[in-house]
Amino acid sequence: MKVDHFTILTAHRFGNAFDSMLRLRHKVFVERAGWVIPNLNHREADQFDHPLWTHYFTIRDENEVVRACGRMVRTDHPYMLEALWPELAHGHELPKSARVAEGSRMCVDPDLPKGAHTYHHALCTLAGMEWAWAHGIEHFVFVTYPSKARALEQLGLKPTIYGPAIRIGEEEFLAGHYSTAPSSSQRIRDVFGIEGSVIDIHEHEEEVAA
């Protein structure tokens, strides 16, 4: 199983993956989680889905339906933690660097069986780290639920958490960062028996712009 990587400008190379990804995000964040965020016609997107610098990672099933996805924006561009919830940093200096990116909108189809759900999450996380490290990105910052932060710890990523969770709307969130170095992702490979590259590292003019 391989993970696709694309930007809005290169999404046409992957069939209907971009639209299918937006539908999955709507299913997870709007329908299931109840977030009040921009959406239309069963698709979710926001101001951080930018054609020039947002990168996407998706896993499609045999019917070309996206079952897992994640989003990455370098922190030298506008990103969620800095723009929307800087208080989650608890005084830590927020990065503004091409060597640090924010991972967001990571989700897996909730209708997948538990084992497949866990594997898809691990594989998508690993793909993002692999691509980032190959492109000079050394850390991911994130905003997530406390339970998801514990899941990152269980994956062996050893996240640095900036401070206690803060209630935003009806739920609590926290922020932190973790390394994208290959040594950080080794536990994921060991636990799930993943060997070799999980994503094709290639360059296209549209992809290297950001």
Where are these regions (language model features)?
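Acyl-donor binding region in acyl/amide transferases
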Residues: 80, 86-173, 177-182
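Short amphipathic alpha-helix that is part of the acyltransferase structural core
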Residues: 1-47, 51, 56-63
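Short, His- and charge-rich active-site/binding loops that engage polyanionic ligands
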Residues: 63-93
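Short connector loops at helix/strand junctions that flank enzyme active sites
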Residues: 52-54, 67, 96-101
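Charge-rich, low-complexity intrinsically disordered segments
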Residues: 102-105, 170-210
